[in-house]
Amino acid sequence: MGKYFGTDGVRGEANVELTPELAFKLGRFGGYVLSQHETERPRVFVARDTRISGEMLEAALIAGLLSVGIEVYKLGVLATPGVSYLVRTEKASAGVMISASHNPALDNGIKFFGSDGFKLADEQELEIEALLDAKEDLLPRPSAEGLGALVDYPEGLRKYERFLVTTGADLDGLKIALDTANGAASVSARNVFLDLNADITVIGEKPNGLNINDGIGSTHPEKLQDLVTETASDIGLAFDGDSDRLIAVDENGAIVDGDKIMFIIGKYLSEKGLLAKNTIVTTVMSNLGFHKALDSCGIHKKVTAVGDRYVVEEMRQFGYNLGGEQSGHVIIMDYNTTGDGQLTAVQLTKIMKETGKTLSELASEVTIYPQKLVNIRVDNSMKERAMEVPAIAEVIAQMEGEMAGNGRILVRPSGTEPLLRVMAEAPSNEEVDYYVDTIAAVVRAEIGLD
């Protein structure tokens, strides 16, 4: 990670850390870096989620892009994967998404996509950071016809919706509960599943700028669980604020997380001979039960650091077509270049329809080990160096010794927030509580801010 860019672009509290001034510079410098080798006038697509700060940052970012002669296509509210899809298929120079994903409304973020629809390489981010830190802005300042033009492009949303529908199956007879998190999916998910002939009920579809991810969506699926049981739905589908992740709920109201979703899609593709190299790419956060289920089906796995960008890097480098995270980021490279919650939902429901199986039946092959994750607020300067604190390193080693191989511990910094995450898996909830609580107590005593 760089000075400004984290694992998923630039993020911070809107108007405090991520200011309009910074957004303008990101537009100006990012646009320049991503389009300097273009032979024709560059085109950049810009979208946002439903946060109250989105329009403020959008205006500043677009001003920066226009100031270096870029033609900007303004998409309005659209899912993050919609941007990557449109950039790639419409042959744009780049795309920019204004969102803080699953974070609360006070935060926002800016992330760039290259012309291939993928997030930026580290080298490109460092080039933008160098311009941000330069003492003087020496970039060209065109005037008159050299300035960029702004184009409203609402057709982008319709094109993305049509793409999603073309990947699915007729869902006639399937009853679906949707939770669009008062976020970007609130403008598209209803249309997509109605076009697929599903019988739908929707919550989290009334964004007001402040209620995005607020007790709702993929990080808060409790309301969706209740809705599924109340409406006797076959499946519940919960997206996050920018709709790049999906958490599902089965017909009994039980959570089906990213691990189980990846297993279901991976097994389906494997049985059809469509799973590239018969391998799924996942992260260190995936549950032991997920690994055991893959082993039982003869499916291979590759494990990366946490963050969908690392999953995508592994997939691109070695030619895999399915990967993701327990949190619900699922990348299906045959269709899109980034995690896509609505695409994943369409594929999951297609599998249910084609197999005639309930979601609980499809997910039953994965027996999840009890897992506990605690987030501890720490100073940003300490979260990367926690393992250098002797007391923390010692307690982790002690707990791992007590596990004797029957479980695992993972202590890692958040890529987007000032948090240290302490996670453990073990055969019982009592053991998990003991391991996590013991380590967390030491972390709080040594470097915690709470």
UniProtKB/Swiss-Prot annotation:
It catalyses: alpha-D-glucosamine 1-phosphate = D-glucosamine 6-phosphate. Keywords: Isomerase, Magnesium, Metal-binding, Phosphoprotein. Activated by phosphorylation. GO terms for cellular component: cytosol. The active site is at S101 (phosphoserine intermediate). The keyword Magnesium applies. The modification Phosphoserine is found at S101. Its EC number is 5.4.2.10. One of its GO terms (biological process) is carbohydrate metabolic process. Catalyzes the conversion of glucosamine-6-phosphate to glucosamine-1-phosphate. This is Phosphoglucosamine mutase. The gene is glmM.
